[in-house]
From Swiss-Prot:
<keyword id="KW-0678">Repressor</keyword>
<keyword id="KW-0238">DNA-binding</keyword>
<keyword id="KW-0804">Transcription</keyword>
<dbReference type="GO" id="GO:0003677">
    <property type="term" value="F:DNA binding"/>
</dbReference>
<keyword id="KW-0408">Iron</keyword>
<dbReference type="InterPro" id="IPR036388">
    <property type="entry name" value="WH-like_DNA-bd_sf"/>
</dbReference>
<comment type="function">
    <text>May function as a transcriptional regulator that controls feoABC expression.</text>
</comment>
<feature type="binding site">
    <location>
        <position position="59"/>
    </location>
    <ligand>
        <name>iron-sulfur cluster</name>
    </ligand>
</feature>
<dbReference type="GO" id="GO:0005506">
    <property type="term" value="F:iron ion binding"/>
</dbReference>
<keyword id="KW-0479">Metal-binding</keyword>
<protein>
    <recommendedName>
        <fullName>Probable [Fe-S]-dependent transcriptional repressor</fullName>
    </recommendedName>
</protein>
<feature type="binding site">
    <location>
        <position position="62"/>
    </location>
    <ligand>
        <name>iron-sulfur cluster</name>
    </ligand>
</feature>
<dbReference type="InterPro" id="IPR023732">
    <property type="entry name" value="FeoC"/>
</dbReference>
<dbReference type="InterPro" id="IPR036390">
    <property type="entry name" value="WH_DNA-bd_sf"/>
</dbReference>
<feature type="binding site">
    <location>
        <position position="54"/>
    </location>
    <ligand>
        <name>iron-sulfur cluster</name>
    </ligand>
</feature>
<keyword id="KW-0805">Transcription regulation</keyword>
<comment type="similarity">
    <text>Belongs to the FeoC family.</text>
</comment>
Amino acid sequence: MISLLQVRDAVALNGRADAKLLSHQLSASLSMVEAMLEQLTVMGKLEKLNATACLSGSCKQCPEVQQCDTVVYRIAGGY
């Protein structure tokens, strides 16, 4: 079983990460990782990046842009 600290550390190591990436890296269920990310956000340890903060910069040209609803997290206060 993973801990909140492991999830927070994984986000810190990645800089920015989504639940799917963390689920794979930590070998944990997606629903567990999503719940932990939400808890860390409520605690003020992580923050959600807005939907326009695309990691690749190509979202505006992507045909799936309307269906892509990936939430990305980073350490709170990190710029």
